[in-house]
């Protein structure tokens, strides 16, 4: 059985990501000064008595990260603070973000922008994959509260707007899961705590403005966009959605200006014969692809 991952709250040190670094973009670490690292002399080559193995003992200069803004967590050269509200939005709803650990190391993530727009006592980010009542008493208490909702689409989910009209208790807290769709599914179904709150979903035809990251379908929204729509409904204030989307629009604009490409949804690519990868042989995955091609909600 896979060992359980320890959950953390936002701000705690994260373990270094495994694997090689991705190609540099305006949001990634700058290259080490001084050009490319020295290459080892091939075995048997003349003119250098130092063996290739000896290079392992040489000191390594680590690339320095560019200075980041303390508020929006972006590099200072592309700081998004001018697009954030001057003061945090005054809301009564408490937002809990359950973030998959892999999202914490992503450069183009939306949760830091969302947190920068809200009061610290109204936005709590918990990082992890497995949560239990024994290990997180606070989260368990929140999940058992009758005023707590969890935003996750599915057959058992009620449309948020319809729920607040019929519910005798007005929601005070809403939980969102931050990660890829497969990561979010894993967190939702493998944590019994998240079955306790009332499950709701958004009924919207709005297309995502987070165009620099591929989504499964044209109707999938980023975590920030989901929070913007949900909070505007719960707070009965459409200006909240506009305010929260402003830094996301600026983020995408900056990236496109620096060479990023618009990422079309997997659904669009499949339906138009543009999907670059071969179709999977696994029957379950193949069935998902067919549903996407036919615009069937999965």
UniProtKB/Swiss-Prot annotation:
Compartments reported by the entry: Nucleus; Cytoplasm
Motif DXTW: where in chain: 178-181
Molecular function terms, GO-annotated: tRNA-uridine aminocarboxypropyltransferase activity
Residue ranges with Low complexity bias: 34-45
Chain intervals for the UniProt region annotation (Disordered): 1-55
One GO term of the biological process aspect: tRNA modification
Annotated Gene Ontology cellular component terms: cytoplasm; nucleus
Catalytic activity: a uridine in tRNA + S-adenosyl-L-methionine = a 3-[(3S)-3-amino-3-carboxypropyl]uridine in tRNA + S-methyl-5'-thioadenosine + H(+)
Residue positions where N-acetylmethionine is found in the record: 1
UniProt-listed InterPro entries: DTW, DTWD2/TAPT
Phosphoserine sites (modified residues): 132
Key words of the record: Acetylation, Cytoplasm, Nucleus, Phosphoprotein, S-adenosyl-L-methionine, Transferase, tRNA processing
Biased composition (Basic and acidic residues): 1-10
EC number: 2.5.1.25
UniProt cross-references to Pfam families, sorted A to Z: DTW
Function, as annotated: Catalyzes the formation of 3-(3-amino-3-carboxypropyl)uridine (acp3U) at position 20a in the D-loop of several cytoplasmic tRNAs (acp3U(20a)). Also has a weak activity to form acp3U at position 20 in the D-loop of tRNAs (acp3U(20)). Involved in glycoRNA biosynthesis by mediating formation of acp3U, which acts as an attachment site for N-glycans on tRNAs. GlycoRNAs consist of RNAs modified with secretory N-glycans that are presented on the cell surface.
Membership in a protein family: Belongs to the TDD superfamily. DTWD2 family.
UniProt name for this protein: tRNA-uridine aminocarboxypropyltransferase 2
Gene assigned in the entry: Dtwd2
